[in-house]
């Protein structure tokens, strides 16, 4: 452990401005990176031992560590449980200094934890100043990254954070709508819609998955979420029979079943995958009097509706597979033209849900993005403690948080 890391274990109490801040500034001004990891310290010590011919040390060292335990991780892990308010302010000042010198907000440490995870373990709530500061740093970093990319949205994939060098600029796509990170040909189905639409699907009792790779397209643990969403889509609960609703992405038909139970005037379903369309025909969705099936990608079918200008919706829901957050931004352009002034837009919110810190960051980014369209996003926080599956029958989980932020987006 370097002197910088040792300082951040808070060896002296109380945590005072006069003791800690000057020392931290000294280390950073002397050239020690704010992203200097414990793993880099260990690698340096390893090389030193090798130069000195310490064979025993060389053989006992694990060269395969790919975590990034940054100074912020050390600070968060060392936070006293009995910390006082005045000490918290000093810690906040230290965090600000680390961020000024380029500290990252979302690296994964040797225990597979983010700084946010560690703050929560040290009795800092999601609304605490330290956790909120971390979220603010994440939002700022992601928006800056988007700006540097010329407007393209490229969120960090937390699966990719393990093994990257903290000093590197990382530009990889993040989980958008039940998508997985791109890392191999096996992942192409989940990351590329054109590949997905040509991929054979399989309906199981409790899930819709890709037949070969076992990617989870939709699972029945989402039922309560879909029930909540279906209620959101009807702005006037006393006039559901006059409502016109659009759902983008049929999947297992969970939300569409809830929508039908409310007997809307018209129920549009946009679906592009041939296997899903075949299932819809087999289950009688094409024969329902108030249902209109839009076969094809929403990018094509909804633009046709927009051009005609004949149909406007009380509620629009979006839940697709293998699309990115950039696709949601593109959808906003269509939504504002198809939704009624008092209408509601919502979507399955899996943005960054493989890590709770990322999930909290993307929650705020959505609020910022919809505001540019003159809209606002209100969230309902829903506990998932007894709902998440064990993921044994799917290749990789697409939702790891024990809570869900349900978005309700309307014109402000």
UniProtKB/Swiss-Prot annotation:
Region (Disordered): 48-69, 169-189
UniProt superkingdom: Eukaryota
Binding site for S-adenosyl-L-methionine: 196, 226, 250-255, 271-273, 298-299, 319
Biased amino acid composition, Basic and acidic residues: 48-65
Statement: the UniProt record of this protein carries the keyword Methyltransferase: yes
Modified residues (Phosphoserine): 181, 184
Protein's name according to its UniProt entry: Protein arginine N-methyltransferase 2
């Amino acid at each position: 452990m370097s002197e910088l890391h040792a300082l951040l274990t808070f060896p002296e109490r109380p945590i005072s401005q006069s003791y800690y801040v000057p020392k931290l500034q000294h280390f950073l001004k002397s050239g020690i990176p704010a992203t200097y990891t414990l793993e880099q310290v260990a690698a340096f010590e390893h090389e030193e031992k090798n130069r000195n011919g310490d064979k025993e040390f060389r053989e006992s060292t694990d060269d395969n560590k790919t975590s990034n335990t940054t100074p912020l991780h050390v600070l968060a892990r060392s936070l006293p449980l009995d910390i006082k308010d005045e000490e918290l302010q000093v810690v906040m000042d230290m965090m600000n200094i680390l961020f000024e010198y380029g500290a990252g907000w979302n690296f994964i440490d040797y225990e597979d934890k983010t700084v946010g995870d560690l703050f929560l373990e040290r009795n800092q709530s999601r609304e605490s100043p330290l956790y909120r500061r971390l979220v603010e740093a994440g939002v700022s970093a992601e928006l800056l990254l988007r700006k540097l990319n010329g407007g393209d949205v490229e969120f960090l994939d937390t699966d990719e954070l393990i093994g990257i060098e903290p000093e590197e600029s990382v530009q990889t796509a993040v989980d958008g709508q039940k998508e997985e990170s791109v890392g191999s040909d096996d992942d192409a189905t989940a990351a590329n819609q054109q590949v997905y639409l040509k991929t054979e699907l399989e309906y199981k009792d409790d899930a819709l998955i890709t037949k070969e790779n076992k990617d989870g397209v939709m699972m029945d643990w989402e039922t309560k979420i879909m029930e909540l969403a279906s209620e959101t889509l009807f702005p006037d609960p006393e006039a559901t029979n006059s409502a016109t609703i659009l759902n983008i992405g049929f999947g297992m038909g969970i939300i569409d079943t809830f929508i039908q139970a409310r007997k809307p005037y018209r129920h549009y379903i946009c679906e592009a995958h041939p296997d899903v369309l075949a299932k819809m025909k087999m289950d009688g969705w094409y024969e329902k009097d108030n249902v209109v099936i839009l076969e094809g990608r929403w990018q094509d079918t909804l633009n046709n509706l927009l051009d005609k200008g004949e149909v406007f919706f009380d509620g629009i829901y979006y839940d697709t597979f293998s699309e990115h957050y950039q696709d949601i931004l593109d959808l906003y352009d269509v939504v504002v033209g198809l939704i009624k002034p008092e209408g509601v837009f919502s979507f399955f919110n899996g943005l960054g849900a493989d890590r709770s810190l990322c999930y909290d960051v993307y929650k705020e980014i959505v609020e910022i993005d919809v505001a540019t369209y003159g809209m606002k996003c209100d969230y309902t926080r829903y506990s998932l403690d007894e709902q998440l599956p064990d993921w044994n029958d799917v290749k990789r989980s697409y939702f790891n948080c024990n809570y869900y932020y349900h978005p309700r987006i309307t014109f402000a």
